[in-house]
Amino acid sequence: MVYSVGLTGNIASGKSTVAEFFSELGINVIYADKIAKELTSKDTPCYQDIILHFGSSVVLNNGELDRKHIRDIIFSNSNERLWLESLLHPVIRKKIEEQLIVCTSPYCLIEIPLLFNKHHYPYLQKVLLVIAPLESQLDRIVKRDHCTKKQALAILATQPNLEQRLEAADDVLINESGLSELKAKVNKLHQKYLREAKIKQ
């Protein structure tokens, strides 16, 4: 199977921008969140399980899941978050594996927001952690989710702590300057992963 790098980091750390930079370099990127969205689209088995568990309050008028409402529930209740993770994560892992088989680039990048146990993803050779200063994260969450700073802090509080993240990481990318510096750091890592992927072959 192709050499694989897991890309992770707390919410609003700049993961998606980093993933875009790798994509611009010709690297196939698999998005765990996108897979999760597809798995929970209308009338799928996971969609049915979620409605059975949470009730009709999580369904919009058009029949789609009210993702914002579900997000609010799981951010305020760790048991509900764990239930949802235990439902989705095994299926997401399987789908990632299927996509890796058809990967055409020298190595593959997999964006997995909640990656703090490498053993759950045995096909990963490396884990790249993106971290950003707290204030930057808060600003991004407030702008993106149109929420208050207090709500943004509550969202961040549900994320794995940095120590947990660092334990799983092989490489750490600090996103604290502008985009050009971030791009330069990605280019450097890209060269490193190309070398490592070549050695693996």
UniProtKB/Swiss-Prot annotation:
A single GO molecular function term of this UniProt record: dephospho-CoA kinase activity
Coarse class of the protein's main subcellular location: cytoplasm
Keyword Transit peptide: no
GO biological process, one term: coenzyme A biosynthetic process
Location of the DPCK domain: 4-201
This protein's record includes keyword Nucleotide-binding: yes
Protein name: Dephospho-CoA kinase
Organism: Legionella pneumophila (strain Lens)
Gene behind the chain: coaE
